């Protein structure tokens, strides 16, 4: 079993004292390992258990499953997925089959671990099974009108329920009941880890904002809804040109929307330009699916390749997405993110969180005592770089807003709040 960092141990300990509560940990702080440690203890100490893990997306549900099973590999743990995606494990969205699978495992005095999404959580509720513990990953997603009914029902069904997030959402007015400030549903905040603590521990690196002046070497005409793909492709290549050629970059590009993303890839030569510079290209959207270079692949293959390439220091790639990779997805090795759109505060914080994970060599050196966590000048990856194209007063306002969010989270230790 792995060892926990101090902030993870603190969260784990407080979970043993409460049956409900919110755990607020910045992106990159290892929330999943806190869940796994808690699950391991209760599976070991309390006999047969039914545990549910909820994620906002199928891709993340599959990733969480793999991370759980790396540690919880007993033959007594029976795994079920409740969503419409691909998985090698038993999967269903039919409530009667959910009940049959769970009750069979429990009748054999064994455990059932269910991985589901907020979208499919109602199917688990409708199955009528008893649930010992439920972990809500990226719990702020449960505040949405479409998802709250399942979250509310689970707050009455599960014996233990814990809500993990880096970006709490607050309710007010007509949405007050759904907000995470409603302790009747979400419990109170039982652990709040400030981001500066994680930076001091060497658990994450700080983000660095690098504005790109689109008027200085960029395009000479205004960006409109008609020319977005061409302008964004041009600016992207200008940004890539300016990267440090001594280090292989792994770049996450947040596109304005699926239409612009697809047009960039199919109606401009950006893919060929990136290929000529030695980059592999990956992209994923709900509408078009997952692609590696120009080959369409399943999501499991996509995620497996993403992990392998992320860990390969000799591989450089650009991954395009609209929103599917913003929350929770662990992509090791990402060095840069390029924001081609003005993101809402939660999505902005989540996207930045994708590139502030510590490089594996730096993490190993810290664990061996060969590297002091705060001496970033000696890190192989001293920062996670965030670039946004700016043009004129509006662009400057975007940069200022982005810097304000970064300072609040990573210098002042204030988690980004948004409203339902």
Over which residues does each language-model region extend?
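Conserved interdomain linker/interface between the two RecA-like ATPase lobes of SF2 helicase motors
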Residues: 187-259
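Conserved strand-helix element at the start of the C-terminal RecA-like helicase core
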Residues: 50-62, 239-271
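Walker A/P-loop
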Residues: 18-38
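Post-DEXD/H (motif II) to motif III coupling segment of the RecA-like Helicase ATP-binding lobe
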Residues: 141-204
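Conserved helix-turn-beta segment of the N-terminal RecA-like "Helicase ATP-binding" lobe
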Residues: 59-95
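Conserved RecA-like P-loop NTPase helicase motor core
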Residues: 141, 288-416
């Amino acid at each position: 079993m792995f060892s926990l960092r101090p902030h993870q141990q603190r969260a784990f300990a407080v979970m043993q004292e409460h049956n409900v509560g919110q755990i607020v940990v910045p992106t990159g702080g290892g929330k999943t390992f806190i869940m796994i440690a808690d699950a391991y203890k209760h599976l070991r100490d309390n006999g047969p258990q039914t545990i549910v893990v909820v994620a906002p997306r199928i891709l993340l549900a599959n990733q969480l499953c793999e991370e759980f099973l790396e540690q919880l590999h007993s033959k007594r743990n029976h795994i079920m997925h409740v969503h419409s995606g691909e998985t090698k494990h038993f999967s269903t969205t039919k409530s009667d089959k959910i009940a049959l699978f769970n009750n069979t495992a429990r009748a054999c005095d064994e455990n059932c671990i269910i991985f589901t999404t907020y979208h499919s959580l109602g199917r688990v509720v409708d199955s009528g099974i008893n649930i010992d513990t439920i972990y809500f990953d990226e719990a702020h997603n449960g505040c949405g009108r479409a998802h709250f009914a399942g979250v509310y029902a689970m707050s009455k069904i599960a014996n233990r329920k814990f809500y993990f997030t880096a970006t709490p959402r607050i309710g007010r007015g007509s949405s007050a009941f759904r907000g995470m400030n409603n302790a009747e549903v979400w419990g109170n905040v039982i652990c709040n880890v400030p981001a500066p603590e994680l930076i001091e521990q060497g658990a994450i690196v700080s983000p660095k904002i690098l504005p790109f002046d689109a008027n200085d070497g960029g395009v000479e005409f205004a960006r409109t809804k008609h020319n977005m793909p061409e302008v964004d492709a041009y600016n992207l290549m200008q940004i890539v040109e300016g990267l440090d050629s001594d280090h292989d970059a792994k770049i996450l590009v947040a596109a304005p929307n699926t239409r612009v993303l697809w047009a960039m890839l199919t109606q401009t030569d950006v893919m060929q330009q990136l290929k000529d510079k030695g980059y592999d290209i990956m992209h994923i959207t709900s509408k078009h699916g997952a692609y590696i270079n120009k080959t369409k692949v399943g999501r499991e293959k996509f995620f497996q390749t993403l992990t392998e390439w992320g860990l390969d220091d000799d591989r450089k790639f650009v991954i395009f997405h609209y929103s599917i990779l913003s929350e929770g997805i662990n992509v090791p090795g990402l060095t840069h993110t390029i924001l081609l759109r003005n993101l809402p505060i939660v999505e902005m914080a989540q996207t930045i969180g994708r590139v502030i994970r510590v490089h594996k060599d730096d993490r190993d050196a810290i664990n061996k005592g060969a590297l002091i966590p705060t001496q970033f000048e000696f890190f192989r990856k001293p920062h996670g770089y965030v670039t946004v194209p700016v043009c004129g007063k509006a662009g400057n306002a975007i940069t200022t807003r982005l810097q304000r969010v970064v300072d609040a989270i990573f210098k002042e230790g204030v988690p980004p709040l948004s409203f339902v």
